């Protein structure tokens, strides 16, 4: 995903982004490190905050069955 890149481009700290989204800083760290996939609601909130489309921030890969 491109969360860290977008956050830094806007001069935001992880704590500031977490506060703006109503989540913990640890959640932001996990998102940026790709260890956590956000709910659709959180992904939508992140996209709205950055003024971008969800698919421009997140890279969705289909899992093989």
Show the residue positions of the predicted features:
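DNA major-groove recognition helix of helix-turn-helix/homeodomain DNA-binding modules
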Residues: 41-56
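Residues in the recognition helix of alpha-helical DNA-binding motifs
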Residues: 6, 20, 31, 60
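Short alpha-helical DNA-recognition segment
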Residues: 12-30
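Amphipathic, hydrophobic secondary-structure cores in small proteins
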Residues: 29-44
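A short, Lys/Arg-rich alpha-helix, primarily the initiator
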Residues: 1-9
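Alpha-helical residues within the helix-turn-helix
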Residues: 8, 19, 48
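Short, charged recognition helix plus adjacent turn
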Residues: 58-65
């Amino acid at each position: 995903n491109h969360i860290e890149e977008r956050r830094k481009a806007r001069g935001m700290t992880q704590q500031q982004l977490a506060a703006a989204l109503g989540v913990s800083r640890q959640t932001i760290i996990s998102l940026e490190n790709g260890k956590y996939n956000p709910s659709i609601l959180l992904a939508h909130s992140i996209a709205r905050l950055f003024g971008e489309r969800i698919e421009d921030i997140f890279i969705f890969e289909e899992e093989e069955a």
